[in-house]
Amino acid sequence: MKTANRLGFERFVVVQPSAYGRDNSCLVDAMKELGVSKCRAIVDVDDDVSDTELEKLNALGARGVRINVSPIHPYEDGLADRLLKRIGRMEARCAEIGWQLDFLLPGWLTEHLLQRMSKLKVNFTLAHMGMLLAKDGPNQPGLNRLIDLLVNGNGHCWIKLTAVYRMSKVPGYTDAEPIVHRLMDAALNRLIWGSDDPHASFADQVGSVELFNLLGEWAPDEASRKAILLDNPVKLYGF
């Protein structure tokens, strides 16, 4: 919270970490401590979670379900098809309660699932810019397809400018900037920034202040930063 206060943040979106699986206890504690006026959350739940449990989480500030596959998961034939059942079930549950889906996926899996995502009837976010690797450049096929979805889709797709250190290994993450600019040009009104604090296994390599300052380089104009940091998350998470 010291870093958040230093940066001037007053509202928060907390996301269930992969390390905790579907045990949302710590996340629930955070929601209770912060309060629903200041906090929203993305939880990870079983497909057969009860309506009562979802309603309890909703009252605390939960607004979505995470679809979680390790962002470094290597290509696995058939994995995309196996995920379709969970995506369909969670889409239906989210639609009932007014929630969204939050995807954490490796880039190859993001690309494989874009067609299914284009048909979703609820809002959804792609963490870490879909994990489309910066080394593959701003004209890579997956990014082109994502841009097409942002421009020509139904408006449900939102992009998280998070954890650039996962998709770029270049000092200063300079190779990610052209990708960010393409996303900004395509759909500035559906981009949100997140610190991804506490950065898990990258904590000794990167800090939230550094990442916040990087956003200032990507979006030097105040209007763009206001959209990404304030207007868009208020709309998406219902503050």
Q: Language-model segments: what does each one mean?
A:
Residues 4, 27, 57, 94, ...:
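Conserved, mostly hydrophobic/aromatic
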Residues 80-193:
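Catalytic pocket-lining loop regions of alpha/beta-barrel enzymes
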Residues 25-42, 117, 121-126, 176-187, ...:
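Short, electropositive alpha-helical surface patch
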Residues 1-11, 188-190, 203-239:
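Mid-to-C-terminal alpha-helical segments outside catalytic/metal-binding sites
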Residues 47, 131, 199:
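Short, glycine/acidic-enriched loop or turn micro-motifs at the edges of active sites
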Residues 1-18, 22, 58:
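An N-terminally biased module of ancient metal coordination in phosphate/nucleic-acid-related enzymes
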Residues 19-108, 160-167:
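Active-site gating/metal-coordination segments in enzymes
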